[in-house]
A protein has these predicted regions:
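Structural alpha/beta surface segment adjacent to cysteine/selenocysteine redox centers
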Residues: 1-87
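C-terminal cap of thioredoxin/glutaredoxin-like
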Residues: 3, 65-173
């Protein structure tokens, strides 16, 4: 599996937006949506906090690509997801991102230089362009060959995608 950056609400200001602000012009029942996400998370055994805001993930995506170049991509992404979805942290803030980098044993100083110098800006731009070209409009989206699986789906749906694209099912044990 390869992580790709995706422009999810890219115009969100650094301070974030209340979910009511984000969905102000859309027919979204935020309490119902959050209850559904909470139940789905619980059913999957995943922690999920009480989110009230959304934050701009652009810099987190840039740092995530850097973490991947340091063989710490999965650990960084998991730490960022926990910070955002469980702890409600503002992942647009550099101090938060530096803490996340340090939490997965990456150099805080190197991470600061990556963010300050925008060393992975072009790479994130390329991922965003790729998602537009592929017609991806939501996350998560899993793509194999020309097949897509969009949204939070049960494990079995992902398994069907993988098997349909020629990968053999692993045997337990």
């Amino acid at each position: 599996m390869q992580w790709r950056a995706f422009p999810l609400h890219p115009n969100t200001p650094e301070a974030g937006l209340l979910l009511e602000e984000l969905f102000a012009n859309q027919p979204v029942d935020i309490k119902k949506m959050m209850a559904h996400l909470g139940k789905t998370s619980a059913d999957l055994g995943l922690p999920f906090g009480e989110r009230k805001r959304t934050y701009n993930s652009r810099l987190a995506q840039e740092l995530g690509l850097w973490a991947e170049s340091r063989n710490a991509g999965d650990a960084f992404h998991m730490a960022a997801f926990k910070a955002y979805f469980v702890d409600g942290k503002n992942i647009a803030k550099i101090p938060v991102l530096l803490d996340l980098a340090a939490s997965v044993n990456l150099s805080r100083e190197e991470a600061d230089a990556v963010l300050t110098g925008r060393a992975f800006k072009t790479a994130v731009d390329a991922d965003w362009a790729l998602s537009r070209e592929a017609g991806i409009t939501a996350v998560p989206t899993f793509v194999m060959n020309q097949d897509k699986l969009v949204g939070a789906k049960p494990y079995e749906a992902l398994e069907r995608l993988v098997v349909a694209n020629g990968l053999k099912k692993r045997q337990a044990g």
